[in-house]
């Protein structure tokens, strides 16, 4: 499949111009909001891959520049907001975040978007807690073609080994970003799932037939790759997974390397 330069505007001659619009999706009885970006289409009846983007916690970084770059490269892109945050209905929780990834992928695969998406080419991108949700969704039966994890957050590492850092949950809960069923829901979920959500323990449940690309920042003090990713990575490598691990000299959100990041994400989806 042909991809295009993510750093150049679409070349003339399309049969359908790039466009964008909002999405409303039902997730377990609540409406969640999303948005799609449609690439320029150059052939009648053409279907293109789709990248589904999962944001972190609480989600100030939406990686919209990456979404636009992937759209310019020829992909449909869908980004969305989990239940209980950024206007989506319902209550926020870690388990709801995982369920909502399933919801969006199922929505796309069902054809309900009405877009000419190649549903055999669904790619998943997860940043930080979006990486947590992506991995846990994959471990509970989610089917996609390729996965890119940017600085994924193994929050159960903190639950098991750095409980003092979980005090930040109280601060974020008090920020007003989340609508919660009860004030202690996040701590309660971590106590219940500290073993089954812990990244190394996911490996035996992850699909082995798809390629994984994981990128961590050498200056990341939020979710350092050495502690959050490498124990899982070693187990994946020992069990024959198709996994590529990269490190780059940047922080948790890669603010200093956005153009390089866009090219790297596209290359992973294009070549693997």
Residue ranges and their predicted role:
Residues 1-45:
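N-terminal cap/lid segment of alpha/beta-hydrolase-fold proteins
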Residues 10-12, 144-233, 238-239, 255-263, ...:
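The alpha/beta-hydrolase serine catalytic core
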Residues 48, 55-59:
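Active-site glycine-rich loops that stabilize anionic/oxyanionic intermediates
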Residues 54-56, 216-217:
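The conserved beta1-alpha1 loop
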Residues 58, 63, 83-119:
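Catalytic nucleophile-loop/oxyanion-hole region of alpha/beta-hydrolase
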Residues 70-89:
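Conserved alpha/beta-hydrolase
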Residues 84, 245-255:
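Histidine-bearing beta->alpha loop at or near hydrolase active sites
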Residues 107-168:
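Primarily recognizes the serine-hydrolase "nucleophile elbow" in alpha/beta-hydrolase
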């Amino acid at each position: 499949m042909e991809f295009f330069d993510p750093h150049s505007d679409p070349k003339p001659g399309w049969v359908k111009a790039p466009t964008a619009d909002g999405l409303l999706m039902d997730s377990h009885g609540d409406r969640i909001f999303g948005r799609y970006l449609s690439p320029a289409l150059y052939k009648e009846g053409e279907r293109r891959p789709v990248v589904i983007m999962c944001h972190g916690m609480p989600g100030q970084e939406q990686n919209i520049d990456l979404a636009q770059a992937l759209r310019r490269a020829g992909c449909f892109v869908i980004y969305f907001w989990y239940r209980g945050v950024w206007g989506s209905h319902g209550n926020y929780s870690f388990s709801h975040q995982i369920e909502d990834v399933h919801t969006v992928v199922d929505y796309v695969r069902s054809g309900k978007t009405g877009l000419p998406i190649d549903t055999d080419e669904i790619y998943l991108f997860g940043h930080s807690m979006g990486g947590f949700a992506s991995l846990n969704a994959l471990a509970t039966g989610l089917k996609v073609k390729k996965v890119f994890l940017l600085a994924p957050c193994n929050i159960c590492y903190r639950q098991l080994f750095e409980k003092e850092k979980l005090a930040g949950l109280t601060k974020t809960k008090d920020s007003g970003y989340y609508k919660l069923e009860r004030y202690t829901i996040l701590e309660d979920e971590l106590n219940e799932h500290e073993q089954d959500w812990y990244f190394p323990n996911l490996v035996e449940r992850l699909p082995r037939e798809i390629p994984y690309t994981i990128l961590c920042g050498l200056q990341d003090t939020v979710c350092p790759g050495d502690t959050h990713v490498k124990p899982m990575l070693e187990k994946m490598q020992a069990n024959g997974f198709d996994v590529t691990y990269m490190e780059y000299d940047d922080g948790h959100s890669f603010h200093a390397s956005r153009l390089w990041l866009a090219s790297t994400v596209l290359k992973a989806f294009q070549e693997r």
